[in-house]
Amino acid sequence: MSGSTITPWVVGNWKMNPMRANANQLIEEFKQLLQQNQIADENCHVGVAPVSIALTTVQAQLQDAARTVYTVAQDVSRVAGTGAYTGEVSAELLKDSQINFVLVGHSERRDIFGDNVEILKAKLQNALNAGMTVIYCVGESLEQREQGQAEQVVLQQICDIAPVVTAEQWQNQVVIAYEPIWAIGTGKTASPQDAQAMHAKIREGLCQLTSAGSNIAILYGGSVKAENAVELAACPDINGALVGGASLNAASFYQIVQAFAQSK
């Protein structure tokens, strides 16, 4: 069951980059490209995920962009509300700053910082209950792929979160991002055929979990570049991209947005 009628998303994950002056320049250059070559909001959802201390600054800079560009948090606390939790930022605090979108489950959070299933479920549930839209990341390692376990691993990651997501939240607040771990920041990319095959399996799994399965956007993340964006965008179940390094270059990021906006 294809998701080809879904409005695509392109989200730039800046990770722990860049310094403030470079971030300001990056946003201004991207805004200029949007002004010169406008892409309608209805053709593609666009977001950028800066470091947490830059969220409101970037959001303010984007207010006068020629189209809507969402500001996305890279992470959220597993603890809700407010309280004595040094270093944490809750979903409610993000919402209070008009940050309505968040990444949860990125492989770097899982692998480097120990975000396990229970932690991710808590983060996801808190964000959804606060009214945020969550881009939930799933993906397999190279070892898991080589052992023929890729589909099983990815589908299990989605099934793991099903108990904390309501039918209405699946419909309105969840985006899935498939990021093969072996392709992140390595320059390696799953072939469009391999990526589409996995996205089709994810779509099938989502349709078994929820009646909203055919309407959930599934993004590809794994060394997405301007050079491969058109091919990826042509795949029926690839509904956008979670872009890493290429989003730190305004021209490259714009070309990726353009590729997906023109594909559907």
UniProtKB/Swiss-Prot annotation:
GO molecular function: triose-phosphate isomerase activity
InterPro entries documented for this protein: Aldolase_TIM, TIM_sf, TrioseP_Isoase_bac/euk, Triosephosphate_isomerase, Triosephosphate_isomerase_AS
A GO cellular component entry from the record: cytosol
UniProt KW Cytoplasm keyword: yes
Residues annotated as the enzyme's active site: H106, E179
Domain of life where this protein originates: Bacteria
Known EC number: 5.3.1.1
UniProt record, GO biological process: gluconeogenesis; glyceraldehyde-3-phosphate biosynthetic process; glycerol catabolic process; glycolytic process
Keywords, comma-separated and alphabetical: Cytoplasm, Gluconeogenesis, Glycolysis, Isomerase
Subcellular location field: Cytoplasm
UniProt entry tagged with the keyword Isomerase: yes
Pathway: Carbohydrate biosynthesis; gluconeogenesis; Carbohydrate degradation; glycolysis; D-glyceraldehyde 3-phosphate from glycerone phosphate: step 1/1
Binding site for substrate: N13, W14, K15, G185, S223, G244, G245
Ranges in a coiled coil: none
One Pfam family here: TIM
Gene3D superfamilies: Aldolase class I
Catalysed reactions, semicolon-separated: D-glyceraldehyde 3-phosphate = dihydroxyacetone phosphate
Family note: Belongs to the triosephosphate isomerase family.
Quaternary organization: Homodimer.
HAMAP family noted in UniProt: TIM_B
Function: Involved in the gluconeogenesis. Catalyzes stereospecifically the conversion of dihydroxyacetone phosphate (DHAP) to D-glyceraldehyde-3-phosphate (G3P).
Listed name of the protein: Triosephosphate isomerase
Organism of this sequence: Acinetobacter baumannii (strain AB307-0294)
